[in-house]
Amino acid sequence: MSSGFSHMDGDGSITMVDVGDKKDTRRTAIVRGKVEMAPATLDMLVKQALPKGDVLTTAKVAGIQAAKRTWELIPLCHPLFLSYVDVRFTVDESLPGVVVEAEARTTGQTGVEMEALVAAQVAAMTIYDMCKAVQKDIVLRDCRLVYKSGGKSGEFRAC
């Protein structure tokens, strides 16, 4: 029984993909998401006037740490040697809120999409955590892979 899913064996049971015979290639993944909040909350974030301190620096560190621990959080992910992880933020008053962008890179046998996704989501959740004292209805949305390269499937760019 072939499901087409790489994490299922012939019997339909889950399995960790064997990447042992795959060639090492340079791999990159970029993920983007949004954290929407009230203009007043965004203003406090920009002015570093929130009770918990410097939101974006804390969120950046949290996202980078999370990327490095992805294999511990997602059951069938491989532990990877990440050569680069970054989390970047753009304040967007038209949202209003913050656009979170996470990038992960490696040279290896499997991709870094999950690491970039986890980095972006944890960074966004950290922004929520640090702002929730002044606003509870902050919205995390539209987190998605926008670019990947490397491996057998090659390059992907979201429309």
Curated annotation (Swiss-Prot):
Gene3D superfamilies assigned: Molybdopterin cofactor biosynthesis C (MoaC) domain
Keywords: Lyase, Molybdenum cofactor biosynthesis
Binding-site positions, substrate: 76-78, 114-115
InterPro entries on file: MoaC, MoaC_bact/euk, MoaC_sf, MoCo_biosynth_MoaA/MoaC, Mopterin_CF_biosynth-C_dom
EC number: 4.6.1.17
This protein's record includes keyword Lyase: yes
Biological processes per GO annotation: Mo-molybdopterin cofactor biosynthetic process
GO terms, molecular function: cyclic pyranopterin monophosphate synthase activity
Official protein name in the record: Cyclic pyranopterin monophosphate synthase
Organism for this UniProt entry: Oleidesulfovibrio alaskensis (strain ATCC BAA-1058 / DSM 17464 / G20)
